Amino acid sequence: MSSFIQNQFEQNFITTNVDHVFNWARKSALWPLTFGLACCAIEMIASSTSRFDIARFGAEVFRPSPRQSDLMIVAGTVTLKMAPVLKRIWDQMPDPKWCISMGACSSVGGPFNTYAVLQGVDKIVPVDVYVTGCPPRPENLFYALLKLQDKIDTMTTLVKRPTEVRLDETMLEEFKQQIRIAQIQNPA
Protein backbone atom coordinates (compact mmCIF):
# COMPACT_ATOMS: atom_id res chain seq x y z
CA MET A 1 0.00 0.00 0.00
CA SER A 2 2.76 2.47 0.86
CA SER A 3 4.54 1.92 -2.48
CA PHE A 4 1.26 2.70 -4.24
CA ILE A 5 0.96 5.99 -2.34
CA GLN A 6 4.62 6.80 -3.02
CA ASN A 7 4.13 6.29 -6.77
CA GLN A 8 1.01 8.44 -6.75
CA PHE A 9 2.88 11.22 -4.97
CA GLU A 10 5.73 11.23 -7.50
CA GLN A 11 3.34 11.21 -10.45
CA ASN A 12 1.00 13.94 -9.24
CA PHE A 13 3.18 16.49 -7.42
CA ILE A 14 6.09 18.62 -8.42
CA THR A 15 8.57 19.44 -5.70
CA THR A 16 10.46 22.70 -5.98
CA ASN A 17 11.64 25.59 -3.85
CA VAL A 18 9.98 28.94 -3.36
CA ASP A 19 12.75 30.88 -5.12
CA HIS A 20 12.24 28.98 -8.36
CA VAL A 21 8.47 29.62 -8.37
CA PHE A 22 8.76 33.32 -7.44
CA ASN A 23 11.55 33.95 -9.94
CA TRP A 24 9.62 32.18 -12.71
CA ALA A 25 6.59 34.40 -12.03
CA ARG A 26 8.69 37.58 -11.82
CA LYS A 27 10.65 36.98 -15.00
CA SER A 28 7.59 35.84 -16.97
CA ALA A 29 5.50 38.93 -16.22
CA LEU A 30 7.64 42.05 -16.23
CA TRP A 31 5.67 45.29 -16.08
CA PRO A 32 7.78 48.03 -17.66
CA LEU A 33 7.31 51.70 -16.88
CA THR A 34 7.19 54.14 -19.78
CA PHE A 35 10.06 56.54 -19.16
CA GLY A 36 11.12 57.72 -22.60
CA LEU A 37 13.20 60.88 -22.69
CA ALA A 38 14.61 61.14 -26.22
CA CYS A 39 15.30 59.20 -29.42
CA CYS A 40 15.58 55.82 -27.70
CA ALA A 41 11.96 56.12 -26.62
CA ILE A 42 10.88 55.79 -30.27
CA GLU A 43 12.67 52.44 -30.49
CA MET A 44 11.20 51.39 -27.13
CA ILE A 45 7.71 52.19 -28.44
CA ALA A 46 8.47 50.35 -31.69
CA SER A 47 9.33 47.25 -29.67
CA SER A 48 5.70 46.94 -28.60
CA THR A 49 4.30 47.06 -32.14
CA SER A 50 3.19 43.96 -34.02
CA ARG A 51 6.40 43.78 -36.03
CA PHE A 52 8.59 43.21 -32.97
CA ASP A 53 6.03 42.13 -30.32
CA ILE A 54 7.62 42.59 -26.90
CA ALA A 55 4.77 40.51 -25.43
CA ARG A 56 6.67 37.36 -26.44
CA PHE A 57 9.18 38.19 -23.73
CA GLY A 58 6.70 38.76 -20.91
CA ALA A 59 6.82 42.56 -20.92
CA GLU A 60 3.53 43.14 -22.63
CA VAL A 61 1.92 46.29 -21.31
CA PHE A 62 3.86 49.47 -20.59
CA ARG A 63 2.48 50.93 -17.37
CA PRO A 64 1.92 54.66 -16.88
CA SER A 65 2.23 54.47 -13.09
CA PRO A 66 5.36 53.58 -11.09
CA ARG A 67 3.23 51.85 -8.47
CA GLN A 68 2.13 49.29 -11.06
CA SER A 69 5.60 48.66 -12.51
CA ASP A 70 8.59 46.57 -11.60
CA LEU A 71 10.89 47.48 -14.51
CA MET A 72 12.06 50.97 -15.42
CA ILE A 73 13.50 51.33 -18.92
CA VAL A 74 15.34 54.65 -19.00
CA ALA A 75 15.48 55.52 -22.69
CA GLY A 76 17.20 58.76 -23.58
CA THR A 77 19.14 61.70 -22.21
CA VAL A 78 18.73 62.33 -18.49
CA THR A 79 19.22 66.01 -17.70
CA LEU A 80 20.03 67.28 -14.23
CA LYS A 81 16.54 68.75 -13.95
CA MET A 82 15.02 65.37 -14.79
CA ALA A 83 17.28 63.41 -12.41
CA PRO A 84 15.31 64.14 -9.18
CA VAL A 85 12.07 63.20 -10.97
CA LEU A 86 13.57 59.93 -12.15
CA LYS A 87 14.82 59.17 -8.62
CA ARG A 88 11.40 59.94 -7.11
CA ILE A 89 9.68 57.66 -9.63
CA TRP A 90 12.22 54.91 -8.86
CA ASP A 91 11.49 55.26 -5.15
CA GLN A 92 7.73 54.92 -5.80
CA MET A 93 8.14 51.57 -7.55
CA PRO A 94 7.45 48.50 -5.37
CA ASP A 95 10.19 45.96 -4.62
CA PRO A 96 11.55 43.95 -6.31
CA LYS A 97 12.33 46.36 -9.12
CA TRP A 98 14.80 46.46 -11.96
CA CYS A 99 16.26 49.06 -14.30
CA ILE A 100 17.43 48.87 -17.92
CA SER A 101 19.50 51.75 -19.24
CA MET A 102 18.66 51.98 -22.94
CA GLY A 103 21.06 53.80 -25.24
CA ALA A 104 24.30 55.71 -24.99
CA CYS A 105 22.70 58.85 -23.53
CA SER A 106 21.18 57.19 -20.48
CA SER A 107 24.19 54.91 -19.97
CA VAL A 108 27.08 57.41 -20.22
CA GLY A 109 25.59 60.75 -21.22
CA GLY A 110 26.01 60.13 -24.95
CA PRO A 111 27.60 62.91 -26.99
CA PHE A 112 26.34 65.50 -24.50
CA ASN A 113 29.25 66.07 -22.12
CA THR A 114 27.76 69.26 -20.70
CA TYR A 115 26.85 70.63 -17.30
CA ALA A 116 23.14 69.97 -17.90
CA VAL A 117 23.32 66.24 -18.72
CA LEU A 118 23.75 63.46 -16.18
CA GLN A 119 26.67 61.29 -17.28
CA GLY A 120 24.96 57.95 -16.68
CA VAL A 121 21.69 57.09 -14.98
CA ASP A 122 23.60 54.70 -12.70
CA LYS A 123 24.63 57.72 -10.65
CA ILE A 124 21.09 57.95 -9.20
CA VAL A 125 19.48 54.48 -9.61
CA PRO A 126 21.04 51.00 -9.74
CA VAL A 127 21.09 49.69 -13.31
CA ASP A 128 20.73 45.97 -13.95
CA VAL A 129 21.31 45.83 -17.72
CA TYR A 130 22.84 48.33 -20.15
CA VAL A 131 21.72 48.46 -23.80
CA THR A 132 24.29 49.90 -26.19
CA GLY A 133 23.53 51.86 -29.32
CA CYS A 134 22.38 55.26 -30.46
CA PRO A 135 19.51 54.55 -30.63
CA PRO A 136 19.50 50.81 -30.02
CA ARG A 137 17.24 48.63 -32.13
CA PRO A 138 14.24 46.87 -30.55
CA GLU A 139 16.16 43.58 -30.88
CA ASN A 140 18.80 45.00 -28.52
CA LEU A 141 16.07 45.77 -25.99
CA PHE A 142 14.79 42.20 -26.30
CA TYR A 143 18.29 40.87 -25.67
CA ALA A 144 18.49 43.06 -22.57
CA LEU A 145 15.13 41.69 -21.39
CA LEU A 146 16.44 38.14 -21.81
CA LYS A 147 19.58 39.02 -19.84
CA LEU A 148 17.43 40.60 -17.12
CA GLN A 149 15.26 37.47 -17.00
CA ASP A 150 18.42 35.38 -16.56
CA LYS A 151 19.44 37.66 -13.70
CA ILE A 152 15.99 37.43 -12.08
CA ASP A 153 16.12 33.64 -12.36
CA THR A 154 19.18 33.52 -10.08
CA MET A 155 17.78 35.81 -7.36
CA THR A 156 17.02 34.60 -3.87
CA THR A 157 13.75 35.58 -2.25
CA LEU A 158 14.94 36.29 1.26
CA VAL A 159 18.03 38.36 0.43
CA LYS A 160 17.23 41.98 -0.47
CA ARG A 161 19.25 43.59 -3.21
CA PRO A 162 20.24 47.25 -2.91
CA THR A 163 17.68 49.58 -4.45
CA GLU A 164 19.61 52.73 -3.74
CA VAL A 165 22.85 54.18 -4.98
CA ARG A 166 24.91 55.69 -2.19
CA LEU A 167 26.80 58.82 -3.18
CA ASP A 168 29.88 59.87 -1.28
CA GLU A 169 30.02 63.46 -0.06
CA THR A 170 32.20 64.79 -2.89
CA MET A 171 29.92 63.30 -5.56
CA LEU A 172 26.86 64.68 -3.79
CA GLU A 173 28.33 68.19 -3.55
CA GLU A 174 29.44 68.06 -7.19
CA PHE A 175 25.94 66.94 -8.21
CA LYS A 176 24.32 69.78 -6.21
CA GLN A 177 26.75 72.28 -7.75
CA GLN A 178 25.83 71.12 -11.26
CA ILE A 179 22.13 71.50 -10.43
CA ARG A 180 22.73 75.04 -9.10
CA ILE A 181 24.62 76.00 -12.27
CA ALA A 182 21.85 74.58 -14.44
CA GLN A 183 19.21 76.49 -12.46
CA ILE A 184 21.14 79.77 -12.70
CA GLN A 185 21.65 79.46 -16.45
CA ASN A 186 18.11 78.21 -17.16
CA PRO A 187 15.72 79.86 -14.69
CA ALA A 188 12.27 78.33 -14.93
Curated annotation (Swiss-Prot):
The keyword 4Fe-4S applies. One of its GO terms (cellular component) is respiratory chain complex I. Keywords: 4Fe-4S, Cell inner membrane, Cell membrane, Iron, Iron-sulfur, Membrane, Metal-binding, NAD, Quinone, Translocase, Transport, Ubiquinone. Its EC number is 7.1.1.-. It catalyses: a quinone + NADH + 5 H(+)(in) = a quinol + NAD(+) + 4 H(+)(out). Its main location: membrane. It is a peripheral membrane protein. Belongs to the complex I 20 kDa subunit family. NDH-1 is composed of 14 different subunits. Subunits NuoB, C, D, E, F, and G constitute the peripheral sector of the complex. This is NADH-quinone oxidoreductase subunit B 1. The gene is nuoB1.
